[in-house]
Amino acid sequence: MDSEKKNKKKQIAILGSTGSIGTQALQVIEEHPDLYEAYALTANNRVELLIAQARKFQPEVVVIANEEKYAQLKEALSDLPIKVYAGIDAVCQIVEAGPVDMVLTAMVGYAGLKPTINAIRAKKAIALANKETLVVAGELINQLAQQYHTPILPVDSEHSAVFQCLAGEVGNPIEKVILTASGGPFRTCTLEQLKSVTKTQALKHPNWEMGAKITIDSASMMNKGFEVIEAKWLFGVQPSQIEVVVHPQSVIHSMVQFEDGAVKAQLGMPDMRLPIQYAFSYPDRICSSFDRLDFTQCTNLTFEQPDTKRFRNLALAYEAMYRGGNMPCIVNAANEVVVAAFLRDGISFLGMSDVIEKTMERAAFVAAPAYDDYVATDAEARRIAAELIP
């Protein structure tokens, strides 16, 4: 009877369980042990945290992408009946396991693409937190999702908000998707001030707790640029129908305007566990212990236009989206290189946009890329961007 009951729980594979999204997803599972179970946990490098998670949540399988950490992981879990694997190929294979119902793609960057494709082909529901997957290969992912009848449920707070606003609106044309942006820690900085900002300053986001890569992307507004591209593929809208509005309080998570002029918005506390839980429970809503929004404290909700002169990455992302093909893949690869350089003090904050723009000019453009083209583009754009860093 126990095993029968266990099988009724949704079995979730978490790719990137040691990151910000992954750890919060485990909090959701912990709050609803009657509904969800962590079937597989994967991490890139943080083996100590992965060991602690495995001991606590007792998954069937754990995978460490960094093969050098395999022996340490295997030894630490030797007293438990948990299968232990290493390497990116193992991550790609684990998503195909029969018992898995849903795959949460919370890996950072381009690395999330191949496991997501494998999970779609295996007809697993996708809780998509790895936005780079749609930025790099949105057209391919959409084609595969349709071919394999695989649902893609957005975990990004903005796209979850739009998704929730569209509930009950089947057949009602969207006039505009309005993505809100906090503006990041440098919203009020002048161009002159932005020349000298440091990684320590950039890593202090005013509203959200996130990993280092996405926090830098938020500070540079590349994160919002990626979300614009992601929205195009998730919601089937044209680039001209996607608008970004800076909303520093992060209370309204995004909005949809319909052709009659009505606007629906989704509001809530800036807590990623809410969109994670909604992706897990969809189409149902389930109770949570998360903080509630107190409207008496929301005395000042403000909105402003983003400044693409100071934050050029947003304009570059729009340009990539309009050009299509492999251009968003080029932008993503260059961005990953420059963010890594910025985090090791190897490039200035504004210098990141310069390198991305030059990489867009120099990398080979492919109008209708296949998967192999994305792989080649990613490698070429990374090489070009690395050479451009002073």
From Swiss-Prot:
Cofactors: Mg(2+); Mn(2+)
SUPFAM superfamilies noted in UniProt: 1-deoxy-D-xylulose-5-phosphate reductoisomerase, C-terminal domain, Glyceraldehyde-3-phosphate dehydrogenase-like, C-terminal domain, NAD(P)-binding Rossmann-fold domains
Q: Which residues bind NADPH?
A: T18, G19, S20, I21, N130, E132, G211
What cystine linkages occur within this chain?
A: none
Q: Name one Pfam family in it.
A: DXP_redisom_C
- Broadest EC class? oxidoreductase
- Which PANTHER family does the UniProt record give? 1-DEOXY-D-XYLULOSE 5-PHOSPHATE REDUCTOISOMERASE, 1-DEOXY-D-XYLULOSE 5-PHOSPHATE REDUCTOISOMERASE, CHLOROPLASTIC
Record's keyword terms, sorted: Isoprene biosynthesis, Manganese, Metal-binding, NADP, Oxidoreductase
Q: Which GO terms describe its molecular function?
A: 1-deoxy-D-xylulose-5-phosphate reductoisomerase activity; manganese ion binding; NADPH binding
So, what pathway does this thing act in? Answer: Isoprenoid biosynthesis; isopentenyl diphosphate biosynthesis via DXP pathway; isopentenyl diphosphate from 1-deoxy-D-xylulose 5-phosphate: step 1/6
* Record: residues binding Mn(2+): D156, E158, E227
Task: Report which reactions are catalysed by this protein.
Answer: 2-C-methyl-D-erythritol 4-phosphate + NADP(+) = 1-deoxy-D-xylulose 5-phosphate + NADPH + H(+)
In its UniProt entry, what is this protein called?
A: 1-deoxy-D-xylulose 5-phosphate reductoisomerase
Does the entry feature the keyword Disulfide bond, yes or no?
no
Q: GO biological process annotations for this chain's record? A: isopentenyl diphosphate biosynthetic process, methylerythritol 4-phosphate pathway involved in terpenoid biosynthetic process
Q: Which family does it belong to?
A: Belongs to the DXR family.
EC number(s) on file = 1.1.1.267
Q: Indicate which residues the UniProt annotation says bind 1-deoxy-D-xylulose 5-phosphate.
A: K131, S157, E158, S182, H205, S218, N223, K224, E227
So what does this one do?
Catalyzes the NADPH-dependent rearrangement and reduction of 1-deoxy-D-xylulose-5-phosphate (DXP) to 2-C-methyl-D-erythritol 4-phosphate (MEP).
Q: Does the keyword NADP apply?
A: yes
